[in-house]
Amino acid sequence: MKLLQAALGLALLPLLRPASAVEPISLGLAIAGAAASAFTGFISYPRLYCYFRECCLSNRPDKGAAAAALQENLDRQLFGQHLVNKVVVKAVKGFLNNTNAKKPLALSLHGWTGTGKNFVSKIIAESIYKRGLHSKYVHQFVATLHFPHAHSINVYKDQLQSWIRGNVSLCPRSLFIFDEMDKMHAGLIDSIKPFLDYYELLDGVSYRQAIFIFLSNAGAEKITEVALDFWRNGRTREDIQLTDIQNALSVSVFNNKNSGFWHSTLIDRNLIDYFIPFLPLEYKHVKMCVRVEIESRGYAVDEDILTRIADEMTYFPREERIYSDKGCKTVDSKLDYYYDF
């Protein structure tokens, strides 16, 4: 509000002269005109206007800040996912800075529960829009909630197309998140294929600035298989490269009959830009999650409680006990038990 007051004040400076030199009616009209001029300038200047009102990112001048915030938040809050950190930052940053994208950005995040898929999609949303998942430009779909009935799949297809078309018309930089892709009815997601393709315009609307993120547990077995192979061969998880997993992951998801991507045209036509694997989390990563959660609640870290919580998690495979079977998902509830918050 101070910025608006300052703008209005500057506009009124020429009017601050002795009252006798200006007729009352003229003065009133001049003040009204100056106020209108200041307000017009306010709404026509994106940086000032977007300071007070949420703006579509395509109309904002601070796209670079979104990429920087994404990098900072992933570095500080995401553990054990070097591939995710590297690929997501490069993909999103490059896309936001590309003024001539040929298609929307499509990211497919895969891994076990609790490894950080929802967390990363939340961070991406918050990096682009201050209100994050609550932004009117961010749209989240949960398969079991929004598309529960197989017999209604044609209705869902029409609704989904209408929703995407309407919202991208309002904001080209809309973000769409599809959770529980492994529980989505096969064929439904193919209805959005035209929006992810290389069309310049569809019925007068361009979708090339939009971002689509898909979350799924499908392919987690393949990711674990690769991670275990590296571990058994004495190599660290950080040695794993995207090329070691991505192709096998996309094939696994495409052929998984229990996945919403089963024989999907989105994969068949190469419209998913990145299949991003979330590695299963180890004991040390669980401890990192516990520590950050305690600190986020404003409490001193009790190392004994931290260790006890990590020890209570169940790990797999049964003999090696390397990976947490729930990742960091139940850390919150366990902290409630140990701390008198």
List each model region and its residues:
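Extended, charged/polar low-complexity intrinsically disordered regions
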Residues: 2-68
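Pre-Walker A (pre-P-loop) alpha-helix and adjacent loop at the N terminus of AAA/AAA+ ATPase modules
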Residues: 65-105
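Short glycine-rich substrate-engagement loop in P-loop NTPases that contacts/grips substrate
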Residues: 135-171
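C-terminal alpha-helical "lid" subdomain
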Residues: 2-5, 16-38, 122-126, 277-341
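Walker B catalytic acidic pair
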Residues: 179-181
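Walker A/P-loop
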Residues: 103-139
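Conserved catalytic/switch belt of AAA+ P-loop NTPases
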Residues: 165-166, 186-213, 217-221, 226-240
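Conserved AAA+ ATPase "SRH/arginine-finger" region at the nucleotide-binding site
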Residues: 206, 216-218, 226, 232-266, ...
